[in-house]
Amino acid sequence: MRRRNPAALKPPRFPILAFDERELRLALGSVFNLKWLVPGESLVSILWKFGCANALAADFLVQLIDPDIDPSVGVAPVREVVNLMRLRRLLRLPENVLHASLLDAAVPGRYHPAFRYCRQCAAHGYHSVLYQLNDEDRCPAHRQSLETRCLHCGEETPYIVNASLVEAPFRCVSCHSHFSYGRLSLLSTTPAMRRRDRAAISHRLRVRSDDNMDVPRPEQRPRSPADDLRAMRR
């Protein structure tokens, strides 16, 4: 019987590298579109759409935001805590959009600790940073009172970016009932939100940015010749 060469049984000198298939997929290119967002969209709302579009597990997405935190604990969505550069590399969105999606920790007591929502906006897959301000009581687009408690179980959802919140898009973290009037599509809010509703939200953001420093001014699109023509006709 032929004996095997002992040298052939030695382990290879190079290491066998393990990789995460999800990280490789994101490195090759994530799926996201700036047109899916409405002005003033919160980071929580953005992450829900990003996670849905790229089929990411909630705990994995939270770790991508900050690898040093426990996904079950999470991180507060405020500018002084979240690494904006890391967030920009992950989501591939303009810095001003991400800056506007976060709260300002320099203004204590101004924000509600529970997730506040408009049921109609939730039906369109939208949540605004405006809704977390204590002195904002109604949605500027639909004039509905902002809710904090689930209409099914009565519990509140903490406004913290953790695995429990990320895995429940526009749903209660306690009972997983929808905050909206029914199931919704997360991939785009543009077709669902009427132009006048988007304009009302943008107007309210501009008013808040003029009066306070806690809400950045929404991004302005470049003027077109059609805009100049309409201005001349007024």
Locate the predicted segments by residue.
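A structured, charge-rich N-terminal accessory region that forms the first stable segment of a protein
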Residues: M1-A114, R119, G125-H127, A192-R194, ...
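Short, flexible, mixed-charge glycine/proline-rich loop motifs
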Residues: S101-F115, H127-L133, P140-L146, V161-E167
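Short, cysteine/histidine-rich loop/knuckle motifs that typically chelate Zn2+
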Residues: Q120-C121, R138-A141, H152, S174
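Secondary-structure-rich domain cores
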Residues: C121-A123, N134, E155
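Domain-exit/linker segments immediately C-terminal to small folded modules
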Residues: E147-R234
